[in-house]
Amino acid sequence: TLGVLLVATAAWIASPLLQSGSSEAGKIMANGQRQHQIGSVSFTVIESSAQLEQFLTQAKEQKKLVLLDFYVDWCISCKEMEVNTFANPEANQELQKFVLLQADVTKNSAENQALLKRFGLFGPPGILIFDLNSEELKDQRVIGYMPPQRFVERLKKSLGN
């Protein structure tokens, strides 16, 4: 009975994180692209390297840095990043300065696996930032959960502030 009680308690604690912000709840834009809204920012959902290259090219033309968030629906740390970090008002304000992409690798398709492999990631959460030349700022990479204030500092450093 103690085991059942522990499992029930863990499920109760995790339930708000699991219920918030499922990527499937995102809206579909006129161009067919899926969006994932977090606070006042919207991530464009991608699933392949080809899509990433398309958005990196657009961001270069717009002279904006790109933030790529690797995500799966069942990842507790991904949900913590959404609820605690991305939704933080200061983080949300800084995120608006980036082209925001979210690699939803929930399906674990061949394209998803290739995207993870391209950057040497085993799985989410992982956040990569690309400069104006579409090169990853490897020293700014975030693996796992990061609290809001540290994340804001990382974003500001990436932007040169």
Label the predicted regions.
Residues T1-V99, A103-N161:
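Proteins that catalyze or organize thiol-disulfide redox chemistry
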